[in-house]
């Protein structure tokens, strides 16, 4: 009796929940014709322009599924241009010296269950000035683009779930960029940079009309995407990825440089560093025309370590099954250790130490004339 009683209770509860769901969906269908009708959720879009007369020094934009772009104003007046829809409302105001742009999805929760997501929208902000204090942009799936002309004296925060983020602005405070699956790109004159992505690519550096990218410190991290740093000058650089590669080209880092990946390769081309730590599990490490004024610590499990006209004051190199080969620019005192591989290094009594350890790989180093 007890068992059949509880079975009846569970079945009855399930029927009640199913009935409530049907009522909710039925209400949505009755109140709004056909829920999946294209003209209802994916219909016409009306371009809206919001004119701003008040002055402001800070900008905050929070939208749902729209791209965000800052563009110069042609008439020295601020305008916020939105692509409104019947189900997304934009509010634009100036509150406590801050331009606030906010989007709200006006649909009921049950109207969103089977309806297409609100996407393909855009927000463009035409700014009359080129210098502001701070900027915050948050969007779910839209792209974020910040023009090279702008300067922010304080912090800039840019976040998107699946959209790409790019900025070429000059930023005096901290730049924080975050996306789950979107790519991140930053250039310009920067102070400190943090870039985080799960599966997107991260790129730092590049030339602008005002010059090369500069930054005090940069912390770049992605789970499965690539990390690239090009044409940049920094004081400290940290690049970390799970399964992607790390590439640095035409980069100057006056302090410490750290590059770490699990299964990707690490390569430096025309780079100068104060010190270098490079670690990878199954990828190779390549240093070409690269000079490290201090120490190089390079380690890989199954990949090889290769040099081409590279140099450092001291080197510690370690690989399990890969080889260590290449050319250095100045003499070194070599200390080698290999289990089954061959060894061919110059015999020298001057220079910094170069310790090389491998289990089954060969060791072959030459000194450039």
Place the predicted regions along the sequence by residue.
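Short, catalytically relevant binding-site loops at active-site mouths
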Residues: 284, 294, 304
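Acidic (Asp/Glu) and glycine-rich low-complexity loops/linkers
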Residues: 1-160, 166-179, 183-222, 228-241, ...
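C-terminal amphipathic alpha-helical segment
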Residues: 286-289, 307-309
């Amino acid at each position: 009796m007890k068992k059949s009683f509880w079975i009846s209770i569970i079945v009855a509860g399930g029927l009640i929940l199913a009935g409530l769901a049907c009522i909710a969906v039925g209400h949505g269908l009755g109140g709004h014709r056909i829920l999946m009708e294209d003209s209802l959720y994916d219909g016409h879009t009306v371009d809206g322009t919001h004119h701003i007369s008040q002055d402001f020094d800070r900008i905050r934009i929070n939208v749902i599924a729209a791209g965000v772009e800052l563009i110069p104003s042609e008439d020295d007046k601020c305008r916020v241009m939105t692509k409104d829809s019947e189900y997304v409302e934009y509010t634009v105001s100036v509150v406590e010296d801050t331009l606030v742009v906010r989007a709200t999805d006006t649909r009921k929760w049950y109207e969103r269950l089977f309806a297409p997501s609100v996407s393909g929208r855009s927000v463009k902000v035409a700014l009359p000035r080129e210098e502001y204090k701070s900027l915050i942009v948050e969007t779910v799936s839209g792209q974020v683009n910040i023009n090279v002309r702008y300067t922010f004296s304080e912090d800039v925060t840019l976040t998107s779930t699946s959209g790409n983020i790019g900025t070429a602005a000059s930023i005096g405070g901290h730049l924080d960029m975050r996306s789950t699956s979107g790519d991140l790109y930053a250039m310009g004159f920067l102070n400190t940079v943090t870039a985080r992505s799960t599966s997107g690519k991260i790129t730092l550096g590049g030339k602008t009309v005002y010059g090369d990218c500069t930054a005090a410190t940069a912390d770049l991290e992605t789970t499965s995407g690539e990390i690239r740093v090009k044409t940049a000058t920094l004081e400290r650089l940290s690049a970390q990825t799970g399964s992607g590669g790390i590439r640095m080209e035409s980069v100057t880092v006056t302090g410490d440089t750290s590059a770490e990946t699990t299964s990707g390769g690490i390569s430096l081309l025309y780079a100068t560093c104060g010190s270098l730590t490079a670690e990878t599990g199954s990828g190779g490490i390549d240093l070409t025309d690269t000079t490290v004024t201090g120490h190089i610590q390079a380690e890989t499990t199954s990949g090889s370590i290769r040099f081409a006209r590279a140099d450092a004051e001291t080197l510690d190199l370690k690989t399990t099954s890969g080889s260590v080969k290449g050319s250095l620019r100045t003499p070194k005192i070599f200390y080698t250790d290999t289990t089954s591989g061959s060894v061919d290094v110059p015999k020298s009594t001057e220079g910094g130490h170069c310790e090389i350890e491998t289990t089954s790989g060969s060791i072959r180093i030459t000194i450039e004339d």
